[in-house]
């Protein structure tokens, strides 16, 4: 009988853009360790479409686990019990660690988040601009509207054009 070879796949389960970008050093480390590119299933496939360490990008909504050898998400590495922990033992405040450092032993020089955007030659952008994304997934990361306004006004006064990013709504 012929057994179909399944592809290795790394699942980036975060729906937030920032957390997804922070997973890019992990992808590079895994690819270098295994000596091959692999598939990535994610909520934001655009982030990985030109990444040289990724063979194929799959939108997580259409992801079929049966076709892939699953490699854990970077947020679940070392997770022993997905149903929870009955008792607390040796509790550590994990907020002291960077998310991409958990379980992958990344060296400081390996922690740079790399982004490989598609070439946009036809898009004529000014030479000095900054993108501002005032919408966050988590309430604890939300900055007051007044603070965003102050930042944007300060940038504008310095001659820097501001491009606002965010959700459609």
Per-region residue spans from a language model:
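Catalytic machinery of carbohydrate-active enzymes
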Residues: 1-169
